[in-house]
Regions:
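Short, threonine-centered small-residue motifs that mark membrane-proximal processing/anchoring sites
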Residues: 18-23, 267-292
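An edge-strand/N-cap motif at the start of beta-rich repeat modules
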Residues: 20-48
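Beta-propeller fold detector
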Residues: 44-52, 93-100, 145-150, 185-192, ...
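Repeated scaffold domains used in trafficking and secretory/extracellular systems
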Residues: 55-65, 103-117, 152-161, 196-206, ...
Length: 310
């Protein structure tokens, strides 16, 4: 029994070391192209374009979000549709129409300016900065169900567990908590003084440690302005106060210059389900790591039961 206990302890140490060294995967969408983002260096490397749906380019992507199965989803603003994104090459598969035609800006081809995120109960949430509405979305076919009006210009969504947060922008530099029953947004706090430029949209994602990362997009600029920063900014948001801390510009290839990044997703925390011991396995870990974690938990439980019997 002592030998088994030593094995379990050694395995847990190895698991901890491997998890600590596991790379946190982050992605961003810029119009029609997926980029892999290095959070430490705030740099972007092109993965690939979304491609075409028939003869139509799949573009104006936003609301990049991981499902509970670690699949990437995004909204296709140019088609008013839901898509699934292949993280290996950036290609998009159209899943269905959102059914929201006629609710967007008539001066911009019915643009709704959409944000999206999954919560830990598997619900897919969708928000429109233009229409000021919150919907749920069927991940299988894109069908939407109206929840209610947010009452504010919400440009991005993110969930921590089943708690929904929204970020303003466009002269509403405020971080909000959103009621999932009514859609109403309640202010948590201001972004603070760090964002010195007009923000068009804020894309957000929590990492496995609970840090809220954000991408600040400045394209298109404020009405009447022609000045556009070359790069979107990587930032962090204090969930308790709403204050933004800018990490730095997300520098990438020339093709990314002055192209706003409107979708952003960090490899998601594992949502805890069911009873028993929860093991956090960061995204990007090799498949055997989760199996090892489960095996070690089972062995540890068997060891403890053996001691109790004796």
């Amino acid at each position: 029994m002592r030998t088994l206990a030593c094995f379990v302890a050694a395995g847990m140490l190895a698991l901890s070391a491997s998890a600590a060294n596991a790379e946190t995967v982050a992605y961003g969408e810029a119009f029609d192209t997926l980029f892999r983002i290095d959070l430490a260096g705030h740099t972007a490397a092109e993965v690939g374009p979304a491609g075409f749906y028939g003869s139509q380019r799949i573009g104006n992507l936003s609301g990049l979000s991981y499902s509970l199965d670690d699949d990437l989803y995004a909204v296709v603003g140019g088609m008013n549709a839901l898509s699934r994104i292949d993280a290996s090459d950036g290609s998009a598969t159209i899943l269905g129409n959102l059914g929201l035609a006629g609710q967007g800006d008539p001066q911009r081809n019915d643009a709704l300016d959409l944000g999206m995120t999954f919560s830990c109960d598997g619900t897919l949430w969708l928000v429109s900065a233009y229409a000021g509405k919150l919907w749920t979305v069927n991940p299988q076919n894109g069908a939407t169900t109206l929840v209610g009006n947010t009452g504010h210009t919400i440009t991005g969504l993110v969930a921590l567990g089943n708690t929904l947060f929204g970020a303003g922008g466009r002269d509403d530099n405020t971080f909000y908590r959103i009621d999932t029953d009514s859609g109403a947004a309640t202010a948590i706090g201001s972004f603070g003084d760090a964002p010195s430029t007009w923000i068009n949209s804020v894309s957000m994602s929590f990492d496995e440690k609970g840090t809220l990362w954000a991408v600040l997009n400045y394209v298109p600029p404020a009405p009447g302005s022609v000045s556009v920063p070359d790069w979107s900014d990587l930032a962090k948001i204090n969930v308790s106060t709403g204050e933004i801390t800018i990490v730095g510009p997300i520098i990438g290839p020339e093709s990314l210059i002055q192209v706003g990044m409107k979708g952003f997703a960090v490899g998601p925390p594992r949502c805890q389900t069911g009873a028993g011991t929860a093991i956090l396995t960061p995204v990007g870990s090799p498949p055997w790591l989760a199996g090892l974690a489960a095996l070690l938990v089972a062995l540890a439980g068997w060891t403890l039961r053996g001691r109790a019997i004796r």
